[in-house]
Amino acid sequence: DCFLKDYGADGCCNEGAQYYRHAGLTLWGCLDILSNVAQDTFSPLFHEPKIKHIAEYICNVHVEGPYYLNFGDCSPLAGRCGAREYRFGQTVGSDALQALAAADFRADADPDHLQNPDGSTHINLWYRLTTAFAEEEMMAYSAAPRHHLTVWYPSAGVYAARQGSWVLGAKFGSNGDSHNHNDTGSITVYKYGKPFLIDIGVESYTKKTFSPQRYEIWTMQSAWHNLPTFDGVQQLPGAEYAAREVCT
């Protein structure tokens, strides 16, 4: 309950795709372990719509190949999906998540599946065992990944749309998110699965990143996103600085 209270009913991770693996996906890990110990108590939680929405978030912000729609501190290269995402999809009954995870796993050129920007992925013994036990299933899973044409997450103001070769991502919401940038209204665009209008994400974390001087860093400022600056005035941080009258 303490974890889930920070999510809206739509399951959006307001920190972005890169942080999904440290948030929703680790929720699955905890519940999976607990349900193996006390099945009657914890297994029913996987039937909760909110948890399924949390699981499928990563599918809905996936563009193509290695790219994800990104905002805030999130990188567009959020890392490959694999066994944990596959099992999460299996547990909540999401064919879309299973298909994405299996396809991503099969596309990995590294036979040991160790090349991931998240270092914990290959040093965590449980993650490695999960991969070993799921590998045969993922290699044989034949369904192709699929995406919704439009997705709207009102809890965080995240929007995604697809038409032909184009993919659009938009960040509405407010400037009060976790790992926030002053990026309300910013957009990213992909064409044929490649970046067209980008969000540069964040530099390497330093002491300043999580200090009162955070918004002195240029990557945090609205002028360095796909946004207008009026008479030299940029956006300010805080939940009160938010999008209004959003139409999707």
Where are these regions (language model features)?
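Active-site lining segments of carbohydrate-active enzymes
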Residues: 1-18, 134-144
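Carbohydrate-active enzyme catalytic cores, enriched for enzymes
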Residues: 22-196
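Residue-level signal for pocket-adjacent positions within structured domains
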Residues: 8, 64-66, 223
